[in-house]
Amino acid sequence: MHIDLNSCFATIEQQANRQLRGRPIAVAAYNSPGGCILASSIEAKRLGVKTGMRVQEGKLLCSDLLILEPDPAKYRCVHLQFREIINCYTPEFSPKSIDEFALNLEGCPAFKLGMHEVAKRIKCDIKNAIGDYITVSIGIAPNRFLAKAASVLHKPDGLDEIHAYNFKEIYAGLKLQDLCGIAANSAARLAESGIYTVMDFYNAKASDLIRAFHSIGGYYWYLRLRGWEIDAVDFARKSFGNSYALPKPFWKLEDLLPILQKLTEKMCFRLHTSGFKARGVGVAVRYKTGNFWHKTRLYADFIYKPGDFFTSAFKLLGLAPYKEPVHTLTVFCFGLIKTDTFQPDLFGVEEKNYKLADAVDAINAKWGNFVLGPASILLSKDLVKDRIAFGGVRELT
Protein backbone atom coordinates (compact mmCIF):
# COMPACT_ATOMS: atom_id res chain seq x y z
CA MET A 1 0.00 0.00 0.00
CA HIS A 2 1.22 3.51 -0.86
CA ILE A 3 -0.19 6.62 0.84
CA ASP A 4 0.34 10.10 -0.62
CA LEU A 5 -0.76 13.28 1.15
CA ASN A 6 -2.37 15.45 -1.53
CA SER A 7 -0.71 18.85 -2.08
CA CYS A 8 1.16 18.33 1.18
CA PHE A 9 2.39 21.73 2.43
CA ALA A 10 -0.46 23.70 0.85
CA THR A 11 -3.20 21.42 2.21
CA ILE A 12 -1.70 21.52 5.70
CA GLU A 13 -1.79 25.33 5.56
CA GLN A 14 -5.44 25.22 4.49
CA GLN A 15 -6.23 22.82 7.31
CA ALA A 16 -4.61 25.20 9.80
CA ASN A 17 -6.32 28.32 8.42
CA ARG A 18 -9.96 28.08 7.30
CA GLN A 19 -9.68 31.36 5.39
CA LEU A 20 -7.30 29.68 2.94
CA ARG A 21 -9.69 26.87 2.06
CA GLY A 22 -11.09 26.88 -1.45
CA ARG A 23 -8.50 29.44 -2.56
CA PRO A 24 -5.56 28.92 -4.93
CA ILE A 25 -2.46 29.05 -2.73
CA ALA A 26 1.14 27.93 -3.04
CA VAL A 27 3.95 27.39 -0.57
CA ALA A 28 7.21 28.75 -1.98
CA ALA A 29 10.78 28.85 -0.71
CA TYR A 30 10.64 32.66 -0.89
CA ASN A 31 7.77 35.07 -1.47
CA SER A 32 9.55 36.75 -4.35
CA PRO A 33 9.17 36.48 -8.14
CA GLY A 34 12.09 34.05 -8.38
CA GLY A 35 11.01 31.90 -5.44
CA CYS A 36 10.47 28.22 -6.22
CA ILE A 37 6.98 26.80 -5.59
CA LEU A 38 7.26 23.79 -3.29
CA ALA A 39 3.58 22.85 -3.21
CA SER A 40 0.41 24.21 -4.77
CA SER A 41 -3.10 23.66 -3.46
CA ILE A 42 -5.60 21.53 -5.35
CA GLU A 43 -7.36 24.73 -6.45
CA ALA A 44 -4.09 26.15 -7.81
CA LYS A 45 -3.21 22.90 -9.58
CA ARG A 46 -6.49 23.05 -11.48
CA LEU A 47 -5.30 26.39 -12.88
CA GLY A 48 -1.97 24.91 -13.98
CA VAL A 49 0.24 25.98 -11.06
CA LYS A 50 2.77 23.21 -10.50
CA THR A 51 5.55 22.31 -8.10
CA GLY A 52 8.90 23.60 -9.37
CA MET A 53 7.48 26.71 -11.04
CA ARG A 54 8.74 30.15 -10.12
CA VAL A 55 6.34 32.40 -8.23
CA GLN A 56 6.12 34.80 -11.16
CA GLU A 57 5.13 31.93 -13.49
CA GLY A 58 2.41 30.83 -11.09
CA LYS A 59 0.98 34.34 -10.84
CA LEU A 60 0.85 34.62 -14.61
CA LEU A 61 -1.43 31.57 -14.61
CA CYS A 62 -3.40 32.72 -11.56
CA SER A 63 -3.27 36.43 -10.72
CA ASP A 64 -4.84 35.96 -7.26
CA LEU A 65 -2.48 33.12 -6.28
CA LEU A 66 -1.60 33.53 -2.59
CA ILE A 67 2.03 32.76 -1.77
CA LEU A 68 3.02 31.46 1.67
CA GLU A 69 6.49 30.75 2.99
CA PRO A 70 7.10 27.29 4.52
CA ASP A 71 6.32 26.40 8.13
CA PRO A 72 8.53 23.31 8.61
CA ALA A 73 7.54 22.69 12.24
CA LYS A 74 3.91 22.37 11.19
CA TYR A 75 4.72 19.88 8.41
CA ARG A 76 6.92 17.76 10.66
CA CYS A 77 4.14 17.62 13.26
CA VAL A 78 1.62 16.37 10.68
CA HIS A 79 4.13 13.82 9.37
CA LEU A 80 4.57 12.38 12.86
CA GLN A 81 0.78 12.23 13.30
CA PHE A 82 0.61 10.23 10.07
CA ARG A 83 3.18 7.82 11.46
CA GLU A 84 1.11 7.26 14.60
CA ILE A 85 -2.00 6.45 12.56
CA ILE A 86 -0.19 4.05 10.23
CA ASN A 87 1.55 2.32 13.13
CA CYS A 88 -1.88 1.30 14.45
CA TYR A 89 -2.26 -0.95 11.39
CA THR A 90 1.27 -2.15 10.73
CA PRO A 91 4.78 -1.61 12.12
CA GLU A 92 6.12 -2.47 8.67
CA PHE A 93 6.02 0.94 7.01
CA SER A 94 8.60 3.19 5.42
CA PRO A 95 8.35 6.99 5.06
CA LYS A 96 9.44 7.63 1.48
CA SER A 97 9.27 11.40 1.94
CA ILE A 98 7.57 13.99 4.13
CA ASP A 99 4.24 13.22 2.40
CA GLU A 100 4.51 9.58 1.28
CA PHE A 101 4.48 6.21 3.04
CA ALA A 102 4.91 2.64 1.82
CA LEU A 103 3.11 0.04 3.95
CA ASN A 104 3.34 -3.75 4.15
CA LEU A 105 0.37 -5.31 5.97
CA GLU A 106 1.24 -8.93 5.28
CA GLY A 107 1.19 -10.91 8.52
CA CYS A 108 -0.49 -8.11 10.50
CA PRO A 109 -3.94 -8.52 12.13
CA ALA A 110 -5.23 -5.60 10.03
CA PHE A 111 -4.53 -7.60 6.87
CA LYS A 112 -7.56 -9.78 7.67
CA LEU A 113 -9.80 -6.74 7.22
CA GLY A 114 -8.81 -6.49 3.57
CA MET A 115 -6.62 -3.85 1.98
CA HIS A 116 -9.51 -1.65 0.82
CA GLU A 117 -11.09 -1.64 4.28
CA VAL A 118 -7.75 -0.71 5.87
CA ALA A 119 -7.33 2.12 3.34
CA LYS A 120 -10.80 3.48 4.14
CA ARG A 121 -10.12 3.32 7.87
CA ILE A 122 -6.81 5.15 7.46
CA LYS A 123 -8.58 7.89 5.50
CA CYS A 124 -11.18 8.16 8.27
CA ASP A 125 -8.53 8.23 11.00
CA ILE A 126 -6.71 11.04 9.20
CA LYS A 127 -9.90 13.11 9.06
CA ASN A 128 -10.56 12.56 12.76
CA ALA A 129 -7.03 12.88 14.13
CA ILE A 130 -5.37 15.42 11.82
CA GLY A 131 -8.10 17.39 10.07
CA ASP A 132 -11.15 17.21 7.86
CA TYR A 133 -9.49 19.16 5.03
CA ILE A 134 -6.58 16.72 4.71
CA THR A 135 -6.94 14.17 1.91
CA VAL A 136 -4.71 11.31 0.85
CA SER A 137 -4.54 9.17 -2.25
CA ILE A 138 -3.93 5.48 -1.61
CA GLY A 139 -2.65 2.85 -4.02
CA ILE A 140 -2.75 -0.92 -3.53
CA ALA A 141 -0.70 -3.39 -5.56
CA PRO A 142 1.56 -6.46 -5.31
CA ASN A 143 4.70 -4.30 -4.99
CA ARG A 144 5.73 -0.82 -3.89
CA PHE A 145 6.29 0.48 -7.40
CA LEU A 146 2.82 -0.43 -8.65
CA ALA A 147 1.21 0.76 -5.41
CA LYS A 148 2.74 4.20 -5.99
CA ALA A 149 1.54 4.13 -9.60
CA ALA A 150 -1.97 3.28 -8.36
CA SER A 151 -1.94 6.15 -5.85
CA VAL A 152 -1.74 8.78 -8.60
CA LEU A 153 -4.48 7.39 -10.85
CA HIS A 154 -7.28 9.47 -9.32
CA LYS A 155 -5.95 12.39 -7.32
CA PRO A 156 -7.02 13.92 -5.01
CA ASP A 157 -8.50 11.57 -2.39
CA GLY A 158 -8.14 8.50 -4.61
CA LEU A 159 -8.21 4.81 -3.74
CA ASP A 160 -7.11 2.47 -6.52
CA GLU A 161 -5.70 -1.01 -6.88
CA ILE A 162 -3.57 -2.55 -9.60
CA HIS A 163 -3.96 -6.32 -9.74
CA ALA A 164 -3.70 -9.26 -12.12
CA TYR A 165 -7.09 -8.56 -13.72
CA ASN A 166 -6.77 -4.86 -14.51
CA PHE A 167 -3.06 -4.07 -14.91
CA LYS A 168 -3.10 -4.23 -18.72
CA GLU A 169 -6.02 -1.82 -18.90
CA ILE A 170 -4.23 0.59 -16.55
CA TYR A 171 -0.92 0.25 -18.39
CA ALA A 172 -2.68 1.09 -21.64
CA GLY A 173 -3.84 4.40 -20.18
CA LEU A 174 -0.41 5.49 -18.93
CA LYS A 175 2.49 7.21 -20.66
CA LEU A 176 6.05 6.06 -20.06
CA GLN A 177 6.90 9.21 -18.11
CA ASP A 178 3.90 8.61 -15.85
CA LEU A 179 5.96 5.81 -14.30
CA CYS A 180 8.05 6.85 -11.31
CA GLY A 181 11.69 6.58 -12.35
CA ILE A 182 11.17 7.10 -16.09
CA ALA A 183 12.21 10.63 -17.01
CA ALA A 184 12.77 12.13 -20.45
CA ASN A 185 16.23 10.60 -20.89
CA SER A 186 15.03 7.10 -19.97
CA ALA A 187 12.02 7.45 -22.26
CA ALA A 188 14.33 8.47 -25.12
CA ARG A 189 16.57 5.48 -24.42
CA LEU A 190 13.57 3.15 -24.53
CA ALA A 191 12.35 4.75 -27.76
CA GLU A 192 15.68 3.90 -29.38
CA SER A 193 14.83 0.26 -28.64
CA GLY A 194 11.35 0.55 -30.13
CA ILE A 195 9.57 0.93 -26.79
CA TYR A 196 7.09 3.82 -26.91
CA THR A 197 4.28 2.86 -24.54
CA VAL A 198 3.93 1.24 -21.13
CA MET A 199 2.51 -1.86 -22.82
CA ASP A 200 5.57 -1.98 -25.07
CA PHE A 201 7.63 -1.73 -21.88
CA TYR A 202 5.73 -4.60 -20.28
CA ASN A 203 5.89 -6.85 -23.35
CA ALA A 204 9.63 -6.34 -23.91
CA LYS A 205 11.97 -9.20 -23.10
CA ALA A 206 14.26 -8.89 -20.10
CA SER A 207 17.31 -9.11 -22.38
CA ASP A 208 15.99 -6.23 -24.51
CA LEU A 209 15.50 -4.03 -21.45
CA ILE A 210 18.99 -4.79 -20.17
CA ARG A 211 20.35 -3.67 -23.54
CA ALA A 212 18.15 -0.56 -23.54
CA PHE A 213 19.33 0.57 -20.10
CA HIS A 214 22.89 -0.74 -20.56
CA SER A 215 22.67 -2.26 -17.08
CA ILE A 216 20.98 -4.77 -14.80
CA GLY A 217 18.48 -1.99 -14.13
CA GLY A 218 16.60 -3.14 -17.22
CA TYR A 219 15.96 -6.52 -15.60
CA TYR A 220 14.69 -4.77 -12.47
CA TRP A 221 12.15 -2.93 -14.61
CA TYR A 222 11.10 -6.24 -16.13
CA LEU A 223 10.35 -7.53 -12.62
CA ARG A 224 8.65 -4.35 -11.35
CA LEU A 225 6.14 -4.27 -14.16
CA ARG A 226 5.20 -7.89 -13.37
CA GLY A 227 4.53 -7.20 -9.70
CA TRP A 228 7.71 -8.59 -8.15
CA GLU A 229 8.96 -6.68 -5.10
CA ILE A 230 12.52 -5.46 -5.64
CA ASP A 231 12.35 -1.99 -4.07
CA ALA A 232 11.90 -3.04 -0.45
CA VAL A 233 15.63 -2.85 0.27
CA ASP A 234 16.49 -0.25 2.93
CA PHE A 235 19.89 0.89 1.73
CA ALA A 236 22.41 1.79 4.40
CA ARG A 237 22.96 5.46 5.06
CA LYS A 238 26.19 6.63 3.41
CA SER A 239 26.24 10.34 4.21
CA PHE A 240 24.53 13.30 5.86
CA GLY A 241 24.39 16.81 4.52
CA ASN A 242 22.59 20.13 4.57
CA SER A 243 22.43 22.79 1.89
CA TYR A 244 20.97 26.25 1.61
CA ALA A 245 20.09 28.47 -1.34
CA LEU A 246 21.13 31.97 -0.33
CA PRO A 247 18.50 34.72 -0.72
CA LYS A 248 21.30 37.31 -1.00
CA PRO A 249 24.41 37.10 -3.23
CA PHE A 250 27.13 36.69 -0.58
CA TRP A 251 30.64 35.91 -1.73
CA LYS A 252 33.00 36.99 1.08
CA LEU A 253 34.17 34.17 3.34
CA GLU A 254 33.26 36.09 6.51
CA ASP A 255 29.67 36.48 5.27
CA LEU A 256 29.38 32.78 4.50
CA LEU A 257 30.79 31.53 7.82
CA PRO A 258 27.62 31.98 9.94
CA ILE A 259 25.66 30.10 7.29
CA LEU A 260 28.27 27.35 7.13
CA GLN A 261 28.20 27.11 10.95
CA LYS A 262 24.42 26.67 11.07
CA LEU A 263 24.41 24.10 8.27
CA THR A 264 27.12 22.16 10.10
CA GLU A 265 25.17 22.21 13.38
CA LYS A 266 22.02 20.95 11.64
CA MET A 267 23.97 18.19 9.89
CA CYS A 268 25.58 17.08 13.16
CA PHE A 269 22.25 16.96 14.97
CA ARG A 270 20.92 14.57 12.32
CA LEU A 271 24.16 12.57 12.40
CA HIS A 272 24.02 12.16 16.18
CA THR A 273 20.28 11.45 16.29
CA SER A 274 20.78 8.60 13.83
CA GLY A 275 23.63 7.18 15.93
CA PHE A 276 26.56 7.83 13.58
CA LYS A 277 29.97 9.46 13.50
CA ALA A 278 31.99 10.19 10.35
CA ARG A 279 35.52 10.25 8.95
CA GLY A 280 34.97 12.47 5.93
CA VAL A 281 33.87 16.09 5.54
CA GLY A 282 32.98 17.92 2.35
CA VAL A 283 31.87 21.35 1.15
CA ALA A 284 30.16 22.17 -2.15
CA VAL A 285 29.40 25.58 -3.63
CA ARG A 286 27.21 26.49 -6.58
CA TYR A 287 27.71 30.05 -7.79
CA LYS A 288 25.29 32.52 -9.36
CA THR A 289 27.40 32.37 -12.52
CA GLY A 290 26.76 28.63 -12.85
CA ASN A 291 30.21 27.55 -11.69
CA PHE A 292 30.36 24.62 -9.27
CA TRP A 293 33.13 23.65 -6.86
CA HIS A 294 33.49 21.03 -4.16
CA LYS A 295 36.22 19.66 -1.91
CA THR A 296 36.38 16.75 0.54
CA ARG A 297 38.78 15.50 3.18
CA LEU A 298 39.02 12.05 4.76
CA TYR A 299 40.50 11.77 8.26
CA ALA A 300 42.23 8.84 9.93
CA ASP A 301 40.02 9.14 13.02
CA PHE A 302 36.26 9.53 13.28
CA ILE A 303 34.72 12.93 14.06
CA TYR A 304 31.72 13.55 16.31
CA LYS A 305 31.88 17.09 17.74
CA PRO A 306 30.14 19.80 15.67
CA GLY A 307 33.10 22.11 16.29
CA ASP A 308 35.48 19.66 14.62
CA PHE A 309 33.19 19.33 11.60
CA PHE A 310 32.93 23.11 11.30
CA THR A 311 36.71 23.62 11.56
CA SER A 312 37.25 21.14 8.75
CA ALA A 313 34.47 22.62 6.59
CA PHE A 314 35.81 26.13 7.18
CA LYS A 315 39.29 25.13 5.99
CA LEU A 316 37.83 23.48 2.90
CA LEU A 317 35.67 26.49 2.03
CA GLY A 318 38.75 28.70 2.25
CA LEU A 319 40.24 26.72 -0.66
CA ALA A 320 37.44 27.70 -3.07
CA PRO A 321 39.05 29.24 -6.18
CA TYR A 322 36.08 31.37 -7.26
CA LYS A 323 35.40 34.83 -5.80
CA GLU A 324 31.84 35.05 -7.05
CA PRO A 325 28.36 35.43 -5.50
CA VAL A 326 27.22 32.12 -4.02
CA HIS A 327 23.88 30.58 -4.98
CA THR A 328 23.91 27.39 -2.86
CA LEU A 329 26.20 26.31 -0.03
CA THR A 330 26.37 22.65 1.04
CA VAL A 331 28.21 20.84 3.83
CA PHE A 332 28.21 17.05 4.11
CA CYS A 333 29.92 14.18 5.90
CA PHE A 334 30.63 10.61 4.84
CA GLY A 335 32.55 7.50 5.87
CA LEU A 336 29.96 6.70 8.52
CA ILE A 337 30.11 4.23 11.38
CA LYS A 338 27.70 3.61 14.25
CA THR A 339 28.64 5.28 17.54
CA ASP A 340 28.09 2.02 19.42
CA THR A 341 31.54 1.00 18.13
CA PHE A 342 33.09 3.70 20.32
CA GLN A 343 36.61 2.92 21.59
CA PRO A 344 37.59 5.06 24.64
CA ASP A 345 40.91 6.88 24.63
CA LEU A 346 43.39 6.53 27.48
CA PHE A 347 42.32 9.66 29.38
CA GLY A 348 38.59 9.60 28.62
CA VAL A 349 38.61 12.93 26.75
CA GLU A 350 36.68 11.61 23.76
CA GLU A 351 34.02 10.09 25.99
CA LYS A 352 33.47 13.49 27.62
CA ASN A 353 33.20 15.13 24.19
CA TYR A 354 30.60 12.58 23.11
CA LYS A 355 28.56 13.13 26.27
CA LEU A 356 28.74 16.91 25.89
CA ALA A 357 27.59 16.79 22.26
CA ASP A 358 24.74 14.43 23.17
CA ALA A 359 23.68 16.67 26.08
CA VAL A 360 23.51 19.72 23.78
CA ASP A 361 21.47 17.71 21.26
CA ALA A 362 19.06 16.58 23.99
CA ILE A 363 18.49 20.16 25.16
CA ASN A 364 17.91 21.43 21.62
CA ALA A 365 15.56 18.53 20.88
CA LYS A 366 13.47 19.38 23.95
CA TRP A 367 13.51 23.18 23.93
CA GLY A 368 14.02 24.03 20.26
CA ASN A 369 16.73 24.18 17.62
CA PHE A 370 19.85 26.16 18.57
CA VAL A 371 18.76 26.98 22.13
CA LEU A 372 22.36 25.97 22.80
CA GLY A 373 25.00 26.42 20.16
CA PRO A 374 27.95 28.51 18.95
CA ALA A 375 27.54 32.28 19.32
CA SER A 376 28.12 32.72 15.58
CA ILE A 377 24.75 31.01 14.98
CA LEU A 378 23.11 34.27 16.10
CA LEU A 379 24.57 35.99 13.05
CA SER A 380 22.76 33.57 10.73
CA LYS A 381 19.35 33.85 12.41
CA ASP A 382 17.86 36.00 9.64
CA LEU A 383 19.92 34.38 6.88
CA VAL A 384 19.29 30.65 7.20
CA LYS A 385 15.61 29.86 7.62
CA ASP A 386 14.35 26.47 8.72
CA ARG A 387 13.68 24.29 5.71
CA ILE A 388 12.45 20.75 5.23
CA ALA A 389 13.39 18.37 2.43
CA PHE A 390 10.64 16.13 1.05
CA GLY A 391 12.90 13.14 1.56
CA GLY A 392 14.54 14.24 4.77
CA VAL A 393 12.38 12.25 7.18
CA ARG A 394 14.59 9.43 8.43
CA GLU A 395 15.62 11.29 11.56
CA LEU A 396 12.16 12.55 12.53
CA THR A 397 10.92 11.05 15.79
Language-model features, listed with the residues they occupy:
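Short, compositionally biased low-complexity segments
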Residues: 54-61, 91-100, 228-240, 284-288, ...
